Amino acid sequence: KVFLMSDAVVAALPNQKDASGKTMQGMLDELVAAGVQVKLCQTCAWARGIGELPLIAGCSLGTLAGLAQDVLQADKVITL
């Protein structure tokens, strides 16, 4: 599972690119195709005005309560 927070939520908008020109959509599409659940912090998305914008297929809004539940159930958590 991947949970995007703060400014990282914009990565789930279509056609976002990094400094090298590689699309974030391509990376997220690969994760989704591999069965990875990709969620965005709903509060962070709304704070940045993107809560109602279309997201990359397979990405969805999630809650902090949902994140807390995932963390409690996980064997390992990696934070970047």
Please report, for each region that a protein language model flagged, where it lies by residue.
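C-terminal structural segments of small proteins and small subunits
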Residues: 48-80
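A broad "ordered helical/assembly scaffold" signature
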Residues: 1, 18, 49-52
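Short internal beta-strands
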Residues: 1-6, 38-42
